């Protein structure tokens, strides 16, 4: 079964071809960082226009790489939400139109579900159930995953998502967009820090998160410093240490409460070196299992959408009708 996957929820255009028998055949990605850098953040209108410009060439590229013709496709999966409504509409309209022209099913995929299943795409032996830590620019959640479509929300952020907190803190310290990754690199390169930041919401029960106060603490520390490059690096390290330890504490609680020792990390922040290292060390200590997608599949991509679509299609779940429905806000559980 051959499925074309289309990701256009925000500022990256991702396209891929997935085969139920051979796995991922090809994928391509266009990042819009250069487009949005001058504005200091993602501009929704520009994001939509970029998707329009790059979607067709990327589809042609992945089909050529996979040596597949359009009429060989069995289905087309597209991200239907959550995300920027204009960006979602570009991908969904294209997918629905092509599916109609080819007389094949279109599959509306939840963006977060695609992230949760990305690790399973590379490790088919990964069995349900498992606990998922979903950490990205727009989300920070702990989710119990019992099967495809069977999700229970254990904890959520009350304000900023992890990636959002990284980006905003970087901006407050004068690091240009996209600053979150730069902030993490500064933290990794810094050997030690004199600062000790709070671990938010770890002194109370529950699995919810809050990072807005940590962001404010970083800003106050920066303003009270001499604002040298060494100060920026030391504050970055203290900030990252606080975020990572907070996530670890919450993961420990989730694993203990669920009595599962299988953890999956999903989303763009899952590429963070410090987080990966800390989770691997802890999970080894409890003789558990932790799964990460490859770095290229942590951030938004078409491969995870194609894979999720293939799984859904094999279960007989396809879109009905030709109406294009996208959901900018769409809870997973």
Curated annotation (Swiss-Prot):
Protein's recorded name: tRNA N6-adenosine threonylcarbamoyltransferase
Query: EC number(s)?
Result: 2.3.1.234
Q: Which UniProt keywords apply?
A: Acyltransferase, Cytoplasm, Iron, Metal-binding, Transferase, tRNA processing
For this UniProt entry, what is the primary localization, expressed as one broad class?
cytoplasm
Any note on cofactor binding?
A: Binds 1 Fe(2+) ion per subunit.
Q: Which cofactor does it need?
A: Fe(2+)
PROSITE patterns per the UniProt record, alphabetical: GLYCOPROTEASE
Q: Where are the transmembrane segments?
A: none
UniProt-listed HAMAP family: TsaD (MF_01445)
- Gene Ontology cellular-component annotations: cytoplasm
